[in-house]
From Swiss-Prot:
This is Aromatic prenyl transferase ptmE. GO terms for biological process: alkaloid metabolic process. Disulfide bonds: none annotated. The keyword NAD does not apply. It comes from Penicillium ochrochloron. The gene is ptmE. InterPro entries: Aro_prenylTrfase, Aro_prenylTrfase_DMATS, DMATS-type_fun. Its EC number is 2.5.1.-.
Length: 425
């Protein structure tokens, strides 16, 4: 009789894979090709085996079912186009590092897509996210889960069926909206003690349908629920800057956490076709409105990171925009904040992954994360062993940087969920 592997030789992912039952081949495919990468990222954060089991089980139960309506771009009859990743996948992974690499955290980004998304039954793909949130509300382990903000903002910033009918009838949506009909996506932070749920909304269609400018729509909806807990002057400074510089557009996102309102931050996201240092500097300082010591120290760190990465500066987005995605930005405001926390997302998609990894390794060492810097390139290769890092250009999608007085340097690296999916790397 041949020898059997000891259970202790198996990883949590391997143990779970032995006994999982899948309701469809599609769900089994997502587990086989995306959960393994997730397991590698969870290990990277120094999670315990118990946490790895917990997070992978959550992925199986509450993330994979969100992709029943996903079809690759080359599949005939595709009814819904997702827009949350440069690759076209409705799934994205990222790892957050702050202060020291021991404080790492995995985040999973998801666009819920039902099998009816884009059809007459669910033309703007609202059904699946409601179904997922209702399911999550029954999970006892999500102790802080709260839907108050979702109920408010989904009504205030997303279209109703009547508004969608009006948009379709008046044909006010440009052809480019074949992808951007999406109005919401989700994020799951795998924290030490529980999973925290985030919501991302795209309010451009609500603004079109209602005839309300985005600046006014966002300000009114935030004041209506937060009242004075989100500092009005701080919010107004950010809103006025974005409005005056034409940064409110079809790519504007709004985000919040599904936790009690008194604890939840808000975030405004956007994209900029000018991937240049001068533009990043302007966004970081909110057009020079904030030049305090903390803001400027963070800017100095950002410049170091910028110079270490193989960034291609563009004053305008090239015609091959899918291959050269724009720079992203975000402003985070927590209850009581007098200064917004900026974040710059440097596009990594279609930059050489070896050069990106080398630049990140050098930066990690500069900020004191020596172990992470020494191991980064090898760990990246171990997650994607079939990819030659010197030739690949799709493993890093975004490199996000922020800095606060409390947390210091805060990095968030976004990755391709799996190299097994059918699109060109």
């Amino acid at each position: 009789m041949g020898s059997l592997s000891s259970p202790t030789d198996l990883t949590p992912y391997q143990v779970l894979s032995k006994y999982k039952k899948f309701p469809s081949p599609d769900e089994e495919f997502w587990w086989d090709h995306a959960a393994s990468t997730l397991a590698d990222l969870i290990k990277w954060t120094k999670a315990t085996p118990a946490q790895e089991y917990e997070f992978l089980q959550f992925f199986y139960e509450h993330v994979i079912p969100n992709f029943s309506g996903y079809r690759p771009y080359d599949v005939p009859g595709r009814a819904w186009n997702t827009g949350i990743t440069p690759s076209g996948l409705p799934l994205e992974y990222s790892v957050n590092w702050r202060n020291i690499d021991a404080n790492a955290m995995v985040r999973v980004g998801v666009e819920p897509i039902s099998q009816f998304a884009g059809t007459a039954r669910d033309p703007y793909s609202h059904y699946k996210i409601w179904d997922t949130l209702n399911q999550l509300s029954q999970v006892k382990a999500l102790k802080s889960f709260d839907l108050e903000l979702w109920r408010h903002f989904s009504s205030a910033l997303c279209t109703s069926r009547e508004e969608e009918a009006l948009l379709d009838q008046t044909r006010t949506l440009p052809e480019s909206f074949s992808i951007a009909k999406m109005q919401h996506s989700m994020g799951f932070d795998f924290c030490d003690d529980e999973v925290v749920v985030k919501i991302y909304l795209i309010p451009n269609m609500k603004a079109r349908a209602s005839g309300t400018p985005l600046a006014e729509l966002l300000t009114g909806s935030i004041h209506a629920i937060y009242r004075d807990t989100i500092d009005r002057e701080t919010l107004a400074t950010v809103i006025n800057y974005l409005d005056s510089t034409s940064n409110f557009n079809d790519a504007t996102w709004f985000s919040f956490d599904c936790i009690p309102r008194s604890q939840s931050r808000i975030k405004l996201y956007g994209s900029d076709f000018r991937t240049t240092w001068s533009r990043a500097e302007d966004l970081w300082t909110v057009g020079g409105r904030y030049t305090d010591a903390v803001t400027m120290k963070g800017l100095a760190y950002l410049k170091e990171l910028w110079d270490l990465l193989p960034i291609q500066d563009f004053e305008t987005l090239p015609e091959q925009a899918v291959q050269n995605p724009p720079m992203l930005w975000a402003y985070e405001i927590r209850p009581g904040d007098k200064i917004p926390s900026p974040r710059i997302y440097i596009p990594g998609h279609c930059l050489n992954d070896k050069k990106v990894a080398d630049g990140l390794s050098a930066f990690f060492k500069r900020v004191g994360w020596s172990d992470l810097g020494d191991q980064y390139t090898d760990r990246l290769f171990s997650m994607f062993p079939k990819q030659d890092l010197k030739d690949s250009t799709a493993l890093h999608t975004w490199i996000a940087f922020s800095y606060t007085e409390k947390s210091g340097v805060y990095m968030n690296c976004y990755y391709l969920a799996s190299a097994s999916f059918p699109f060109k790397l």
